[in-house]
Amino acid sequence: MVSNLLKVVLAIETSCDETAVAVVRSDKQVLSHKVLSQKEHVVYGGVVPEIASRAHINYLYDLTSQSIEESGCDLADIDAIAVTSGPGLIGGLIIGVMMAKAISSVTNKPIIEVNHLEAHTLLIRMFHDIDFPFLVLIISGGHCQFLIVHDVGCYQRLGSSLDDSLGEVFDKVARMLNLGYPGGPIIEQKSIMGDSKSFFLPRALINRFGCDFSFSGIKTAVRNIVVNQKYIDNDFICNISASFQDCIGDILVNRITNAIHMSQAINCKINKLVVTGGVAANHLLRNRISICVKDNNFEVLYPPTELCTDNGIMVGWAGIENLSKGYVSNLDFAPKARWPLESIKRSS
Protein backbone atom coordinates (compact mmCIF):
# COMPACT_ATOMS: atom_id res chain seq x y z
CA MET A 1 0.00 0.00 0.00
CA VAL A 2 1.07 3.57 -0.64
CA SER A 3 1.79 5.88 2.30
CA ASN A 4 -1.11 7.91 3.68
CA LEU A 5 0.86 11.15 3.22
CA LEU A 6 -0.65 13.68 0.82
CA LYS A 7 -0.16 12.74 -2.80
CA VAL A 8 -0.12 15.10 -5.77
CA VAL A 9 -1.17 13.75 -9.17
CA LEU A 10 -0.80 15.37 -12.58
CA ALA A 11 -3.68 14.24 -14.80
CA ILE A 12 -4.10 14.27 -18.58
CA GLU A 13 -7.37 13.67 -20.48
CA THR A 14 -7.49 13.51 -24.30
CA SER A 15 -10.02 10.75 -25.04
CA CYS A 16 -12.36 12.82 -27.23
CA ASP A 17 -12.67 16.54 -28.02
CA GLU A 18 -11.63 18.06 -24.70
CA THR A 19 -7.95 18.64 -24.01
CA ALA A 20 -7.77 18.68 -20.22
CA VAL A 21 -5.02 18.78 -17.61
CA ALA A 22 -5.32 19.05 -13.84
CA VAL A 23 -3.21 18.79 -10.71
CA VAL A 24 -5.15 17.12 -7.90
CA ARG A 25 -4.16 16.36 -4.31
CA SER A 26 -5.26 13.36 -2.24
CA ASP A 27 -6.98 15.61 0.32
CA LYS A 28 -9.48 16.44 -2.46
CA GLN A 29 -7.91 19.79 -3.29
CA VAL A 30 -7.74 20.85 -6.93
CA LEU A 31 -4.50 22.76 -7.41
CA SER A 32 -5.15 23.53 -11.07
CA HIS A 33 -7.70 22.65 -13.72
CA LYS A 34 -7.43 23.44 -17.42
CA VAL A 35 -9.95 22.36 -20.07
CA LEU A 36 -9.92 23.39 -23.70
CA SER A 37 -13.09 22.36 -25.54
CA GLN A 38 -12.30 22.15 -29.23
CA LYS A 39 -14.63 24.49 -31.14
CA GLU A 40 -13.37 23.14 -34.46
CA HIS A 41 -16.05 20.43 -34.48
CA VAL A 42 -19.10 22.72 -34.27
CA VAL A 43 -19.38 23.24 -38.03
CA TYR A 44 -19.45 19.45 -38.56
CA GLY A 45 -22.18 18.77 -36.00
CA GLY A 46 -20.00 16.20 -34.22
CA VAL A 47 -16.46 15.18 -33.40
CA VAL A 48 -14.08 14.60 -36.33
CA PRO A 49 -11.34 12.26 -35.02
CA GLU A 50 -8.49 13.62 -37.17
CA ILE A 51 -9.29 17.22 -36.24
CA ALA A 52 -9.47 16.22 -32.57
CA SER A 53 -6.05 14.56 -32.73
CA ARG A 54 -4.44 17.58 -34.37
CA ALA A 55 -5.99 19.89 -31.79
CA HIS A 56 -4.62 17.76 -28.94
CA ILE A 57 -1.16 18.00 -30.51
CA ASN A 58 -1.48 21.79 -30.75
CA TYR A 59 -2.82 22.39 -27.24
CA LEU A 60 -1.59 19.68 -24.87
CA TYR A 61 1.99 20.81 -24.23
CA ASP A 62 1.06 24.40 -23.41
CA LEU A 63 -1.95 23.33 -21.35
CA THR A 64 0.22 20.95 -19.31
CA SER A 65 2.82 23.65 -18.68
CA GLN A 66 0.13 26.14 -17.65
CA SER A 67 -1.53 23.66 -15.31
CA ILE A 68 1.71 22.79 -13.53
CA GLU A 69 2.61 26.47 -13.18
CA GLU A 70 -0.86 27.40 -11.90
CA SER A 71 -0.74 24.61 -9.30
CA GLY A 72 2.26 26.17 -7.58
CA CYS A 73 4.12 22.88 -7.99
CA ASP A 74 7.03 21.87 -10.11
CA LEU A 75 7.60 18.41 -11.54
CA ALA A 76 9.59 17.39 -8.46
CA ASP A 77 6.46 17.89 -6.34
CA ILE A 78 4.35 15.56 -8.48
CA ASP A 79 3.99 12.05 -7.01
CA ALA A 80 2.44 10.37 -10.05
CA ILE A 81 1.06 10.99 -13.52
CA ALA A 82 -2.44 9.75 -14.37
CA VAL A 83 -3.57 9.58 -17.99
CA THR A 84 -6.69 8.40 -19.76
CA SER A 85 -5.68 5.31 -21.72
CA GLY A 86 -9.12 4.37 -23.05
CA PRO A 87 -11.80 3.99 -24.13
CA GLY A 88 -11.97 6.80 -26.65
CA LEU A 89 -10.68 8.06 -29.98
CA ILE A 90 -7.37 6.30 -30.48
CA GLY A 91 -5.56 9.30 -31.99
CA GLY A 92 -6.25 11.53 -29.02
CA LEU A 93 -5.48 8.75 -26.54
CA ILE A 94 -2.07 8.15 -28.13
CA ILE A 95 -1.17 11.83 -27.80
CA GLY A 96 -2.14 12.01 -24.12
CA VAL A 97 -0.40 8.74 -23.27
CA MET A 98 2.79 9.82 -25.07
CA MET A 99 2.87 13.06 -23.09
CA ALA A 100 2.30 11.24 -19.79
CA LYS A 101 4.94 8.61 -20.54
CA ALA A 102 7.47 11.30 -21.48
CA ILE A 103 6.91 13.11 -18.17
CA SER A 104 7.07 9.83 -16.24
CA SER A 105 10.32 8.82 -17.96
CA VAL A 106 12.00 12.18 -17.39
CA THR A 107 10.93 12.51 -13.74
CA ASN A 108 11.05 8.81 -12.82
CA LYS A 109 7.59 9.20 -11.28
CA PRO A 110 5.01 6.38 -11.44
CA ILE A 111 2.38 6.45 -14.16
CA ILE A 112 -1.22 5.27 -13.81
CA GLU A 113 -3.28 4.38 -16.87
CA VAL A 114 -6.85 5.40 -16.15
CA ASN A 115 -10.00 3.99 -17.68
CA HIS A 116 -12.11 6.95 -18.81
CA LEU A 117 -15.31 5.37 -17.46
CA GLU A 118 -13.66 4.62 -14.14
CA ALA A 119 -12.71 8.29 -13.90
CA HIS A 120 -16.35 9.34 -14.41
CA THR A 121 -17.46 6.72 -11.88
CA LEU A 122 -15.04 7.43 -9.03
CA LEU A 123 -15.23 11.24 -9.25
CA ILE A 124 -18.30 11.22 -6.98
CA ARG A 125 -16.09 10.08 -4.07
CA MET A 126 -14.19 13.35 -4.30
CA PHE A 127 -17.35 15.27 -3.40
CA HIS A 128 -19.42 12.84 -1.32
CA ASP A 129 -18.65 10.30 1.39
CA ILE A 130 -19.90 7.26 -0.48
CA ASP A 131 -18.68 3.78 0.34
CA PHE A 132 -18.58 0.72 -1.87
CA PRO A 133 -20.62 -0.92 -3.24
CA PHE A 134 -22.91 1.42 -5.19
CA LEU A 135 -24.78 1.48 -8.49
CA VAL A 136 -23.65 3.80 -11.29
CA LEU A 137 -25.36 4.95 -14.48
CA ILE A 138 -22.91 6.39 -17.01
CA ILE A 139 -24.67 8.45 -19.69
CA SER A 140 -22.36 10.27 -22.07
CA GLY A 141 -21.58 10.86 -25.72
CA GLY A 142 -19.95 7.47 -26.11
CA HIS A 143 -21.41 5.30 -23.38
CA CYS A 144 -24.66 4.34 -21.68
CA GLN A 145 -24.46 1.61 -19.05
CA PHE A 146 -25.30 0.47 -15.53
CA LEU A 147 -22.60 -1.07 -13.35
CA ILE A 148 -22.20 -2.14 -9.76
CA VAL A 149 -19.07 -0.56 -8.31
CA HIS A 150 -17.73 -3.12 -5.84
CA ASP A 151 -14.39 -1.37 -5.30
CA VAL A 152 -11.68 0.52 -7.16
CA GLY A 153 -10.91 -1.69 -10.16
CA CYS A 154 -13.83 -4.06 -9.54
CA TYR A 155 -16.96 -3.50 -11.64
CA GLN A 156 -19.95 -5.59 -12.70
CA ARG A 157 -22.02 -4.53 -15.69
CA LEU A 158 -25.79 -4.94 -15.41
CA GLY A 159 -26.91 -3.39 -18.69
CA SER A 160 -25.92 -1.08 -21.53
CA SER A 161 -27.12 0.40 -24.80
CA LEU A 162 -27.63 -2.10 -27.58
CA ASP A 163 -27.01 0.57 -30.22
CA ASP A 164 -26.45 4.33 -29.81
CA SER A 165 -25.26 6.03 -26.65
CA LEU A 166 -27.63 8.59 -25.14
CA GLY A 167 -25.35 11.56 -25.75
CA GLU A 168 -24.89 10.47 -29.35
CA VAL A 169 -28.67 10.47 -29.88
CA PHE A 170 -28.96 13.98 -28.43
CA ASP A 171 -26.28 15.16 -30.86
CA LYS A 172 -27.90 13.46 -33.86
CA VAL A 173 -31.35 14.84 -33.07
CA ALA A 174 -29.85 18.31 -32.67
CA ARG A 175 -28.17 17.92 -36.06
CA MET A 176 -31.51 16.96 -37.67
CA LEU A 177 -32.94 20.21 -36.29
CA ASN A 178 -29.86 22.29 -37.25
CA LEU A 179 -29.31 23.24 -33.61
CA GLY A 180 -25.54 22.87 -33.55
CA TYR A 181 -23.10 20.86 -31.45
CA PRO A 182 -23.09 19.68 -28.71
CA GLY A 183 -26.79 18.91 -28.89
CA GLY A 184 -27.70 18.15 -25.30
CA PRO A 185 -27.72 21.67 -23.81
CA ILE A 186 -29.55 23.13 -26.83
CA ILE A 187 -32.28 20.48 -26.83
CA GLU A 188 -32.78 20.89 -23.08
CA GLN A 189 -33.14 24.65 -23.51
CA LYS A 190 -35.62 24.31 -26.40
CA SER A 191 -37.66 21.67 -24.58
CA ILE A 192 -38.47 24.05 -21.73
CA MET A 193 -40.62 26.09 -24.14
CA GLY A 194 -42.26 23.09 -25.82
CA ASP A 195 -45.20 20.73 -25.29
CA SER A 196 -43.93 17.26 -24.40
CA LYS A 197 -47.18 15.67 -25.64
CA SER A 198 -46.91 17.09 -29.16
CA PHE A 199 -45.34 13.98 -30.66
CA PHE A 200 -45.30 10.35 -29.63
CA LEU A 201 -41.91 8.64 -29.78
CA PRO A 202 -41.26 4.92 -29.17
CA ARG A 203 -40.06 3.84 -25.72
CA ALA A 204 -37.91 0.87 -26.74
CA LEU A 205 -37.49 -2.04 -24.26
CA ILE A 206 -39.55 -0.19 -21.66
CA ASN A 207 -41.73 -3.19 -20.79
CA ARG A 208 -38.93 -5.75 -20.85
CA PHE A 209 -36.93 -7.21 -17.99
CA GLY A 210 -33.39 -5.93 -17.49
CA CYS A 211 -31.73 -2.57 -17.83
CA ASP A 212 -30.40 -2.51 -21.38
CA PHE A 213 -31.20 0.49 -23.59
CA SER A 214 -32.05 0.98 -27.25
CA PHE A 215 -32.21 4.46 -28.75
CA SER A 216 -32.00 3.84 -32.51
CA GLY A 217 -35.79 3.68 -32.89
CA ILE A 218 -36.24 7.08 -31.23
CA LYS A 219 -33.66 8.59 -33.55
CA THR A 220 -35.44 7.15 -36.61
CA ALA A 221 -38.84 8.34 -35.37
CA VAL A 222 -37.57 11.90 -34.91
CA ARG A 223 -36.00 11.85 -38.38
CA ASN A 224 -39.29 10.73 -39.95
CA ILE A 225 -41.20 13.49 -38.17
CA VAL A 226 -38.68 16.13 -39.26
CA VAL A 227 -38.64 14.93 -42.89
CA ASN A 228 -42.45 15.06 -43.08
CA GLN A 229 -42.73 18.47 -41.40
CA LYS A 230 -43.38 21.24 -43.93
CA TYR A 231 -42.38 24.16 -41.74
CA ILE A 232 -39.47 23.82 -39.31
CA ASP A 233 -40.11 26.84 -37.11
CA ASN A 234 -39.13 27.48 -33.49
CA ASP A 235 -42.45 26.16 -32.14
CA PHE A 236 -41.91 22.85 -33.93
CA ILE A 237 -38.32 22.62 -32.68
CA CYS A 238 -39.38 23.30 -29.09
CA ASN A 239 -42.21 20.76 -29.26
CA ILE A 240 -40.14 17.96 -30.78
CA SER A 241 -37.35 18.69 -28.29
CA ALA A 242 -39.82 18.48 -25.38
CA SER A 243 -41.32 15.25 -26.73
CA PHE A 244 -37.85 13.78 -27.18
CA GLN A 245 -36.78 14.70 -23.65
CA ASP A 246 -40.01 13.28 -22.22
CA CYS A 247 -39.41 10.02 -24.07
CA ILE A 248 -35.84 9.77 -22.78
CA GLY A 249 -37.05 10.52 -19.26
CA ASP A 250 -39.61 7.69 -19.41
CA ILE A 251 -36.97 5.24 -20.60
CA LEU A 252 -34.48 6.26 -17.91
CA VAL A 253 -37.10 5.94 -15.15
CA ASN A 254 -38.04 2.43 -16.29
CA ARG A 255 -34.47 1.21 -16.75
CA ILE A 256 -33.29 2.75 -13.45
CA THR A 257 -36.11 1.06 -11.56
CA ASN A 258 -35.09 -2.29 -13.01
CA ALA A 259 -31.39 -1.67 -12.34
CA ILE A 260 -32.10 -0.82 -8.69
CA HIS A 261 -33.99 -4.09 -8.22
CA MET A 262 -31.24 -6.06 -9.98
CA SER A 263 -28.46 -4.48 -7.92
CA GLN A 264 -30.22 -5.15 -4.63
CA ALA A 265 -30.78 -8.77 -5.61
CA ILE A 266 -27.00 -9.04 -6.01
CA ASN A 267 -26.09 -7.10 -2.86
CA CYS A 268 -28.77 -5.82 -0.47
CA LYS A 269 -26.31 -3.25 0.93
CA ILE A 270 -26.48 -1.21 -2.27
CA ASN A 271 -28.68 1.84 -1.66
CA LYS A 272 -27.10 4.61 -3.75
CA LEU A 273 -27.16 5.43 -7.45
CA VAL A 274 -24.49 7.65 -9.00
CA VAL A 275 -25.42 9.26 -12.32
CA THR A 276 -22.45 10.61 -14.25
CA GLY A 277 -21.26 11.52 -17.75
CA GLY A 278 -22.11 14.48 -19.96
CA VAL A 279 -25.86 13.80 -20.17
CA ALA A 280 -26.02 13.84 -16.36
CA ALA A 281 -25.68 17.63 -16.62
CA ASN A 282 -29.22 17.77 -18.08
CA HIS A 283 -31.31 19.27 -15.26
CA LEU A 284 -34.68 18.15 -16.63
CA LEU A 285 -33.51 14.54 -16.74
CA ARG A 286 -31.97 14.93 -13.30
CA ASN A 287 -35.37 15.88 -11.93
CA ARG A 288 -37.01 12.80 -13.47
CA ILE A 289 -34.23 10.55 -12.20
CA SER A 290 -34.27 12.01 -8.69
CA ILE A 291 -38.02 11.42 -8.27
CA CYS A 292 -37.69 7.85 -9.57
CA VAL A 293 -34.79 7.02 -7.25
CA LYS A 294 -36.57 8.46 -4.21
CA ASP A 295 -39.67 6.40 -5.04
CA ASN A 296 -37.45 3.30 -4.96
CA ASN A 297 -35.99 4.19 -1.53
CA PHE A 298 -32.56 4.86 -3.00
CA GLU A 299 -30.33 7.91 -2.80
CA VAL A 300 -29.06 9.53 -5.99
CA LEU A 301 -25.80 11.45 -6.30
CA TYR A 302 -24.44 13.54 -9.17
CA PRO A 303 -21.02 15.12 -9.73
CA PRO A 304 -20.97 18.91 -10.00
CA THR A 305 -22.63 19.87 -13.28
CA GLU A 306 -19.46 21.42 -14.68
CA LEU A 307 -17.57 18.15 -14.10
CA CYS A 308 -20.08 15.84 -15.81
CA THR A 309 -18.31 16.37 -19.12
CA ASP A 310 -14.72 15.23 -19.67
CA ASN A 311 -12.12 16.90 -17.46
CA GLY A 312 -8.73 16.34 -15.90
CA ILE A 313 -9.97 16.43 -12.30
CA MET A 314 -11.79 13.11 -12.67
CA VAL A 315 -8.68 11.50 -14.16
CA GLY A 316 -6.54 12.87 -11.34
CA TRP A 317 -8.94 11.59 -8.69
CA ALA A 318 -9.09 8.15 -10.32
CA GLY A 319 -5.30 8.20 -10.26
CA ILE A 320 -5.33 8.98 -6.54
CA GLU A 321 -7.86 6.21 -5.85
CA ASN A 322 -5.67 3.72 -7.73
CA LEU A 323 -2.48 5.00 -6.13
CA SER A 324 -4.00 4.53 -2.67
CA LYS A 325 -4.49 0.84 -3.55
CA GLY A 326 -0.93 0.57 -4.79
CA TYR A 327 -2.06 0.25 -8.41
CA VAL A 328 0.49 1.69 -10.86
CA SER A 329 1.30 0.88 -14.47
CA ASN A 330 4.38 -0.14 -16.41
CA LEU A 331 5.48 2.14 -19.21
CA ASP A 332 4.70 -0.48 -21.85
CA PHE A 333 0.90 -0.14 -21.70
CA ALA A 334 -0.90 0.81 -24.90
CA PRO A 335 -3.93 3.09 -25.31
CA LYS A 336 -7.16 1.27 -26.11
CA ALA A 337 -10.08 2.54 -28.20
CA ARG A 338 -12.26 -0.09 -26.49
CA TRP A 339 -11.74 -0.89 -22.80
CA PRO A 340 -14.83 -2.19 -20.97
CA LEU A 341 -14.82 -1.07 -17.37
CA GLU A 342 -15.56 -4.56 -16.07
CA SER A 343 -12.43 -5.91 -17.84
CA ILE A 344 -9.96 -3.79 -15.84
CA LYS A 345 -6.97 -5.73 -14.52
CA ARG A 346 -4.94 -4.08 -11.78
CA SER A 347 -1.48 -4.89 -10.40
CA SER A 348 0.38 -3.35 -7.46
From Swiss-Prot:
Its main location: cytoplasm. The keyword Ligase does not apply. Its EC number is 2.3.1.234. CDD domains: ASKHA_NBD_TsaD_bac (cd24133). One of its GO terms (biological process) is tRNA threonylcarbamoyladenosine modification. Substrate binds at residues 138-142, 171, 184, 282. Pfam families: TsaD. The keyword Transferase applies. Binds 1 Fe(2+) ion per subunit. It catalyses: L-threonylcarbamoyladenylate + adenosine(37) in tRNA = N(6)-L-threonylcarbamoyladenosine(37) in tRNA + AMP + H(+). Fe cation binds at residues 116, 120, 310. Keywords: Acyltransferase, Cytoplasm, Iron, Metal-binding, Transferase, tRNA processing. It is found in: Cytoplasm. It is an enzyme of class 2 (transferase). One of its GO terms (cellular component) is cytoplasm. Required for the formation of a threonylcarbamoyl group on adenosine at position 37 (t(6)A37) in tRNAs that read codons beginning with adenine. Is involved in the transfer of the threonylcarbamoyl moiety of threonylcarbamoyl-AMP (TC-AMP) to the N6 group of A37, together with TsaE and TsaB. TsaD likely plays a direct catalytic role in this reaction. NCBIfam families: gcp_kae1 (TIGR00329), T6A_TsaD_YgjD (TIGR03723). This is tRNA N6-adenosine threonylcarbamoyltransferase. It comes from Ehrlichia ruminantium (strain Welgevonden).
